[in-house]
Regions:
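Active-/binding-site microenvironments in catalytic and ligand-binding cores
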Residues: 1-244
């Protein structure tokens, strides 16, 4: 029997503040009675970055003139995925091409590759954070394992179509330069974001801030991270895996 694994962080005003700011406001109209049923209409409004929480990056994020995320073919955002187990990676440990050579032998051309470090779950503060897929410790940002340029070049050479992460993308390797991964920054300059530029320059989409990848037990699954049809360089997604 197929099993569905939800890999998305919840979006709410309680979202962990050091990195993201989410503002969801709700307006309720007066209660009316319709055919004997009391109804109180509600409308919510949301303001946040398209790169907030679980989202997908299109090449336009770093390459001028590329298509908006709403014009990316839908089939690029779902399909067969290779799950690469990196759960033994510790604090500030790089994910390299050598790691992929050893652990990614099951990666095929056209795959989505999911890098399973378990870092989100390792930094969940309590039951609520674990349930909602949210990191609750500053160490999530300051001490996480991170992908490297060599890893990104390996992905491009294998002609994968997307790469998904459950750890911060590449911020932590620059902590010793005085950069931060929190909302206030300062963030690394684009020329230092080698993983972003390597992937997106070659049309490899990035799916960031996944969670619950440790619940995936098989090394190949079907995976979905379909964006909204936005005229923007990225979009929130509801990411999930189907394990047969």
């Amino acid at each position: 029997m197929a099993r569905i694994i939800d890999c998305s962080m919840i979006i709410s005003n309680e979202t962990w503040r050091p990195r993201w700011k989410v503002d969801i406001s709700t307006k309720q109209q007066k209660t009316v009675e319709i055919e004997g049923v009391k109804v109180k209409p509600q409308h919510s409004y949301m303001h946040m970055s398209v790169h907030c929480l679980t989202h997908i990056d299109s090449p336009l994020h770093v390459v001028e003139g590329r298509p908006v995320i709403g014009d990316i073919p839908i089939e690029t955002c779902f399909g067969e995925a290779a799950v690469v187990d990196l759960t033994d990676k510790g604090e500030l440990e790089p994910i390299t091409a050598e790691d992929m050579e050893k652990r990614g032998k099951h990666v095929r051309e056209g795959d989505i590759v999911l890098l399973k470090t378990g870092w989100t779950e390792k930094n969940a503060g309590g039951d609520t954070e674990k349930r909602e897929g949210l990191p609750a410790d500053v160490n999530y940002w300051n001490k996480g394992p991170y992908p490297t340029r060599s890893m990104a070049e390996w992905m491009v050479a294998r002609k994968v179509k997307a790469v998904g992460f459950d750890c911060p993308n590449e911020c932590t390797q620059y902590m010793d330069k005085g950069y931060e991964c929190t909302r206030t920054g300062p963030h690394p300059p684009l020329e230092d974001e080698h993983v972003h530029r390597t992937h997106l320059n070659h049309g490899v989409l990035q799916i960031e801030y996944l969670c619950n990848l440790t619940a995936i037990k098989k090394d190949r699954v079907m995976f979905f991270a379909v964006p909204l049809k936005l005229k923007a360089e990225g979009s929130p997604v509801r990411a999930f895996a189907i394990e047969e």
